Structure formats: structure tokens, C-alpha cells
Amino acid sequence: MKRAIAIAASGGELWGALKEDEQVVELRATRGGSASRVGEIWLARIVGLRPELPAALVDIGLARPALLSAEDVAPKSRFKILREGETVVIEIAKDARADKAAGVTMRLSRSLAPPANGKPPQRLDEPAPAVAALIAPWLDPAPDAIAVDDRAIYADLRNWLRARHPALVAGLVAANEALYESSGIADAVEQALASRLALPGGGFLLVEPTALGVAVDVDSGTARSAVAVNLEAARAVARQIRLRNLSGPMIVGFVGMKGKGERARVLATLAKALARHVPDCQVLGWTRLGHVELVRKRKAPSLAESIAAARH
């Protein structure tokens, strides 16, 4: 399978697309300095303990203290002896949201020693260009090619890759055309923001994010058998969860089927597709009302949220 990254500057927005065999499977967007802060390493100070969670509150210079859960303390046994005022080296694992604090971890992706006389909060790693934060999650496994349609962004990314991922420099290309349209980003964005998605064989999905979770309804729309529609829908659901970066609780309402065998076949198809596209998404099974329940831990904003932030 060929993996490639396309980076497009369009209308003041910076877009990144991960493509597998020429199909856009993931999208990310940012504007100016609004890129994700995930991966930043900080010398931080513990400003509070929440044993009921269990977690510690950590000052990294944001308006609200970040959350360091006991599971993210290294070693885990150290959580019991953490004290308010203690300094720790952490890495940002989840961006802050309007209603939630940033999540941090002591399990660093790379080793950095704190300065001898450092005073928290203090960033320890070198600030990366916005484009680096945009595509960092897609660099392992290494992509076969990275195309950029903006010369300044190309130069920033080339310098960053030389310092951090020198093996990827050879695959970096300065595109001579606007990639937002030509690489399929525009079409993928339109699809990812649509509440109704047509299935190739007939029928469609209705995808509705709500305050309680994401609801997905499958409509046959044709005289095709329920099983045929549901099997196609199961694969499409997995692709859409990945493309839209959906998370939290999700309910999928498949077209009604006749027996347990058909339901088992659809569930197995869904599980296989999820394992390929979003392996961190759990299948909880059929509910008593005949829906399939899924859950995926939130690690980053959904694509719709990222686009809204980039356009704010």
C-alpha cells in the first residue's frame, strides 16, 4: 500500500491529507498558530492533586492547568509520592478544548533533559513549524512521498525534516499545482462535512454528531437486501470515523435483518474495517434495541472542530 501526504495552502488555511493508494483517508486543518500542541515537551509544576480521578493538575503556562492522569505518570508507582509544587517533565498528549483541560504524559516520545536552573513552566523542545505539527501523526510508518504546494511552507518543512526525520527528505516534493483541488482534499472535505453520504451500491449513511455522542443511521434507499446494504455501510462507517476523526460514544443503526447469522456477519465486517482504519475504536456489540455501540477515546478534535477553529 502506497502512503503519501499532501499539504495545501488554501484561503489562509493549511491542509494536510494522508492518502493510501491515492485515496484520502485522513484530513487535518489549521490556520496560523492554531496548530495542535500535541508533542510539545515542557518542564512543568504540579499545582494540585486529584486522588479521586486519580490525576495531578500541572501548570504548563495555559489558562487552565493540564491533567496528568495516574496512568501517564512514569513510573506509574510514582503517582503516590507526587507532591504539589514538584517539577516534572511532561509531553502534551491532548490539546485543550473550551470545556476540557489539555492532557499530558510523563511517557515522553523522545528524551530531553531539563535545564539545571530551569523554572517551570518552560518549553524544552524547539518550536516546530505549524506544518510539522499538522503531519507529525502520519510519519510513522514513513510515507512514500510528501508534496507541498507552498514554497515557504516547503522550506520550513524541509529544514524540520532534516533535523528530525532526515530519511524523509528525499521524498519531499514541491508541487507545481494547487493541491487542495488536484489531490482530492476539496472532495474529501465536502464528504467529511456532509451529514448524508451516498453508498456506492445504493442507500446512504446519515452521520449526526450530538452532545451525547455520534449517531449513524443506515438507510437502504433501494430494494437491495438489508445484508448487502449493511455490509457496505459497515466498511463506510469505519472509513468515515477515520476521515472525520470521530470519537466518544457512537451508535450505528443498521437496516433491520432477519437472523443472528446476518447480524454476526455485519458485526464481523465492521470490526475488520475498524481494525484497519481506527484500531483504537472498540466494538461493544449489539444493543437491546438492535443498534451497534462503539466507543473511541478522544485524542484530538474532530475534523469539523478543527475546520471551525481554523476558520474562526
Predicted feature locations:
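Single-stranded RNA-binding surfaces
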Residues: 1-312
